[in-house]
Every structure is written in C-alpha cells, then in structure tokens.
C-alpha cells in the first residue's frame, strides 16, 4: 500500500461531507423520531412500530437494488442524487401536516389514530424510497466512482463517522423543540421539527445540483434489467468475486453484532440505575472521540490496507462491550462506550473501504444494493431479536426500536461481543484469500 495517494479536491470534499452528513441526519430522524412520532401523535403500539421498521428496511433494500442497477445502465449518478434528495426533503416535510390531515379526514379519535398509523407507515416507506434512491444507491455509487484504493480509507473514515455525528445534531436540535407535560411526559413540536429537517434536505439537493460533478460511469449494455438484478445473488457471482463477498460476509456478521446492541444502547444508558437522563453527557463526548478516531484511522487504512487494520477496531469493540457488561459505574460506562463506539465506527470504515476496493467497476450501482441487503436488511432482521432475547429476564421482550416498557440488560453487550467474535473467522478467511491471490 505504498502507492501515491490520489488527491480529492476541496469542492469534492465539501460535497462528500455535505451529502454524507445531511443524508445521515435525515436517516437519524427516520430511525429515531418517526418511531416517537407515531407513538406520540397516534398512540401506535410496539407491533405498529416493528411493522414500520420492517417495511422501511425492505423498501430501502429493494430501492437500492433497483435504482443501483438503473444508474449502472444509464451511466449517471448525479441526476439520481439531486432529484432524489429534493423529493426526499419534501417527503419529510409531509410529516409536519399528518396530524392535521388525519384530524380532517377521520370521523372520530379512534379512526384518526388508525388512519394516522397507516399514513405514517406509508409515508415512511415513501420517504425511505427517495432517501435510498438518493443516498444508498446513487450517492454511494458516486462515492465509489470518484475514489480509488489510495484514498477510500480517508473518505470512509469521514463517511463512517456521520451516522453518530448526525445523532448529535438531530438530538441537539430536538432539545430546542422539546415539550415537557405536567406529568413529566416528553414530546416535541413535530410540525416545526419535520419542516426544518425537510428544508435542510431540500437545500442540500439544490446545493448538490450546483456543486456536484457527474462521475461519468460507463453505461452497461447487453444484459436485461432483471438479469443484471439477479447477477448479484448468483453463487457464480460470489465465486467470481470472492474477495468482495468475503468482505460483505464479514461486514454482515459485524453488523449483526451491532444490531444486537445499538437498538437498545440509549435505552440502556437512560435506565435510572445506569446514567438516567444525564446519559447525553457521556454519550456525546464518546461519539465525538469515536468520530475523531475513525477519521484519523481512515488514513491508516489507506496506508496499510484492510487486513492490517481491521483487527484493532474489532478488539476495541469487544473490549468496550466487556466493560459495559461487567460495570455500571459512570467512569466505566464512559470508557466502555468510548471503546465500543470507536471500534464500531473504525470497523465500519475498514469494511466499507474494502467493499469499494473490491466492487466491480461495471456493477457499482448493483453492488450498493447487495451491500444494503447484506449489512442492513439481514442484520436488522437478526440482531434486535438476539438483543431482546438476552434481555428477556429483565424486561418485556420487544423489537427494540422504542418502548418504555422494555428494560434492556447489560447482557446485550456480552451477546454483541460474542456475535462479533465470528467476524475474526471471516477476516482470517479474507487473509487466506489475499495470500492465495498474491
């Protein structure tokens, strides 16, 4: 890995940071506040929330697969990013008027609640469609197009830090719109909140239209649309692209470990005998430290490559989970969280850069859909249930997205660490593959 690093211009860096951050802000709203909104506004049940999460995950996967192949066939990324981001923003703004619309259309409160739940789930899928079109499919394909194996570690160091940094932005902004009832119940001014977030996303789409350069991928010709879509799921494709699919398998295992922990992480910190409502004073600095570590570690990934850099963040993740399992004192929770989050983001940067390095140049769009299937859909269908199962002795078993009746146990961290150990087996296979191909 001694190649001269390919430079990335300032304007391109600005576009990367802007689209990555704002995209993750929008996803943070979808992943965290839609769940709260559907409960606060319409009294949704935990099963309603679970249905919404599952429907959204399936929508994201199918959209990324279909649009990824489409963008490969037409040889364009920018148009999808710009158009998708603009409509994505308007779809978020639509949530600002859902309560008013349901009140006007429904006959009574019960009908308004049922209609509100249905509309929220439907609009969540619509919002996810445009978000996945713009971000998961087109932006990530563009990011692969414009980078190479000399600078992808740096880019992924920045890109991988955005999901947690966006949580700080979203929750910090939401605190300004927080409403506390006389009985202590916390809710938010949702119309203003969704309008502001939607406007930010729309403005980002306009900025992308002005600043973003087309990556000009070569348009694919020959195969039919469905044949190209099926290509990524064939055993022959996995055999012909063994390094890519091994990295995807390793990322899938690690993402399952993360999904054992992360849906319950904030709920755990907020438990009165852990940190209570002061959890933000521990989580926020940990996120900043972990993000800084990942941005800097990305440079090391570029210099040394995947196999030489993946072990450290995996060990940090396991060590952090071990501390969080064994201790509940605030200093231990801080150190454990710092290690776990640093390991989480660092591992994601390593895996993401390696996936881009092994992605076939003529199937970049399709590969984004395969990535979402392997590292988002499958882990979301597996990990949360493991987390809820190990916590069953100390709380009501639930899907783990929201729910005040659910009390996660520290065993979620032990389970997450245990699942992550299987990642070491896959990384060993990756090293064997690299030696065999050398």
Model-identified regions with their sequence ranges:
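Helix-loop boundary and gating motifs at the non-cytosolic
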Residues: 2-57, 243-250, 254-273, 280
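Structural signature of the two symmetry-related core transmembrane helices
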Residues: 79-94, 308-323
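Juxtamembrane intracellular "pre-TM" segments in multi-pass secondary transporters
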Residues: 1-10, 215-248
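Intracellular juxtamembrane helix-capping segments at the cytosolic ends
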Residues: 133-147, 346-360
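Helix-to-loop junctions at the C-terminal end of transmembrane segments
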Residues: 62-76, 293-306, 391
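Glycine-rich segments within core transmembrane alpha-helices of 12-TM secondary carriers
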Residues: 61, 153-178, 372-384
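Multi-pass alpha-helical transporter architecture, strongest
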Residues: 96-100, 202-212, 409-438
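A membrane-interface helix-boundary motif in multi-pass transporters
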Residues: 77, 110-112, 178-199, 389-419
């Amino acid at each position: 890995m001694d190649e001269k690093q390919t430079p990335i211009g300032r304007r391109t860096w600005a576009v990367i940071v802007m689209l990555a951050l704002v995209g993750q802000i929008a996803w943070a709203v979808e992943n965290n506040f839609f769940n709260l909104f559907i409960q606060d506004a319409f009294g949704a049940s935990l099963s309603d929330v679970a249905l919404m999460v599952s429907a959204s995950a399936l929508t994201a996967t199918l959209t990324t697969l279909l649009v990824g192949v489409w963008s490969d066939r037409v040889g364009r990324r920018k148009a999808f990013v710009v158009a998708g981001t603009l409509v994505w923003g308007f779809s978020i703004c639509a949530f600002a008027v859902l309560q008013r619309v349901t009140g006007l259309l429904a006959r009574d409160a019960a009908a308004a609640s049922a209609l509100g739940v249905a509309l929220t789930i439907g609009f969540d899928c619509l919002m996810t469609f445009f978000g996945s079109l713009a971000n998961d499919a087109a932006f990530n394909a563009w990011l692969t197009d414009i980078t190479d194996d000399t600078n992808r570690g740096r880019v992924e160091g920045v890109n991988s830090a955005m999901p947690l940094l966006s949580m700080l932005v979203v929750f910090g902004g939401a605190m300004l719109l927080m409403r506390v009832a006389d009985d202590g119940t916390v809710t938010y001014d949702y119309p203003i909140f969704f309008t502001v977030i939607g406007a930010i996303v729309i403005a980002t789409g306009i900025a992308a239209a002005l600043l973003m350069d087309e990556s000009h991928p070569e348009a694919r010709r020959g195969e039919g649309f469905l044949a190209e879509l099926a290509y990524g799921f064939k055993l022959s494709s996995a055999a012909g692209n063994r390094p890519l699919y091994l990295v995807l398998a390793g990322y899938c295992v690690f993402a399952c470990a993360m999904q054992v922990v992360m849906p319950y992480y904030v709920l755990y910190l907020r438990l009165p005998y852990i940190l209570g409502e002061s959890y933000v004073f521990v989580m926020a600095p940990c996120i900043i430290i972990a993000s800084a570590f990942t941005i800097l570690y990305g440079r090391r990934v570029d210099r040394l490559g995947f196999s030489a850099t993946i072990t450290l963040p995996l060990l940090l993740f396991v060590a952090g989970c071990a501390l969080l399992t064994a201790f509940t004192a605030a200093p231990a929770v801080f150190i454990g969280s710092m290690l776990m989050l640093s390991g989480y983001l660092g591992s994601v940067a390593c895996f993401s850069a390696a996936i881009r390095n092994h992605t076939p140049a003529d199937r970049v769009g399709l590969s984004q859909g395969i990535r979402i299937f392997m590292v988002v859909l499958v882990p979301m269908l597996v990990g949360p249930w493991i987390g809820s199962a190990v916590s069953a002795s100390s709380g009501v078993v639930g899907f783990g997205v929201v729910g005040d009746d659910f009390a996660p146990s520290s065993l979620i961290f032990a389970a997450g660490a245990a699942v992550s150990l299987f990642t070491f087996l896959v990384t060993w296979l990756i090293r064997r593959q690299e030696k065999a191909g050398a």
